[in-house]
């Protein structure tokens, strides 16, 4: 940014708004990450905390408690085709984010028409009289708006994807998570760390980079043979730093 003529203050603001996106399944971890990012930005721009800068660090949220009956009130002033399209797409997003706290960023969100969905959710017609059906409509709008932001971040492709994945073997997964990874990540299903490797590759744009702190089980175990084959066939490994100190006998090359 400085080479392009930006001041440090403007560069910090632009990086927050255009270059950094973060997702976490845990609300507390999100808060810590948000704080760390904002404090780093403030090091270069003391005005960064004035509320005018958007920081794209989010905690993944579930759609379980959304009152879907409220969808019929949304899209006021839009034509029927737009309303029907938006409603189908919102329903699709809500379906995807059901139990999202169980799955986190391994959920695959479709690339919807986000501008259309934002217009749909922001306009509502609950009639002149308040009814039981429309009670809590504004809360529903706020919740769906938050899910749109998170969903768009999850659907995007990035130049660089960096993560420290969870290390959890299949025996430690609950039934819901285990069934999900078997269905959606069959080659990497034996450990959440390798599931996250596959997901990171999906989130990375063509020619992009991923960097992970991972355990080396995927390099040697036969259960990852197809995963390794696909990884080497479709991608280029630039560098691997392997420490043998903490590798147990069953996974040592």
Feature annotation, model-predicted:
Residues 1-156, 160:
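Class I S-adenosyl-L-methionine-dependent methyltransferase module
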Residues 25, 30, 34-55, 59, ...:
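Signature of N6-adenine DNA methyltransferases within the class I
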């Amino acid at each position: 940014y400085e080479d392009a003529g930006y001041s440090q203050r403007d560069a910090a603001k632009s990086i927050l708004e255009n270059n950094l996106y973060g997702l976490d399944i845990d609300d507390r971890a999100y808060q810590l990450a948000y704080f760390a990012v904002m404090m780093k930005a403030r090091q270069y721009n003391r005005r960064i905390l004035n509320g005018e800068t958007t920081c794209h660090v989010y905690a993944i949220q579930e759609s379980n408690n959304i009152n879907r009956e409220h969808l019929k009130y949304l899209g006021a002033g839009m034509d029927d085709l737009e309303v029907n399209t938006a409603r189908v797409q919102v329903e699709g997003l809500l379906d995807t984010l059901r139990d999202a706290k169980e799955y986190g960023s391994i959920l695959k969100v479709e690339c919807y028409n986000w501008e259309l969905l934002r217009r749909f959710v922001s306009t509502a017609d609950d009639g002149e009289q308040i009814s039981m059906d429309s009670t809590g409509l504004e809360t529903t709008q706020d919740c769906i708006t938050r899910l749109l932001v998170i969903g768009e971040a999850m659907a995007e492709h990035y130049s660089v994807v960096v993560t420290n994945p969870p290390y959890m073997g299949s025996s430690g997964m609950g039934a819901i998570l285990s069934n999900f990874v078997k269905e959606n990540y069959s080659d990497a299903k034996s450990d959440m760390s390798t599931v996250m490797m596959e997901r990171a590759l999906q989130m990375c744009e063509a020619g992009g980079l991923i960097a992970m702190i991972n355990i080396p089980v995927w390099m040697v175990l036969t259960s990852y043979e197809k995963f390794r084959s696909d990884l080497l066939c479709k991608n280029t490994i630039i560098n691997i730093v392997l420490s043998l100190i903490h590798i147990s006998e069953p996974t040592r090359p």
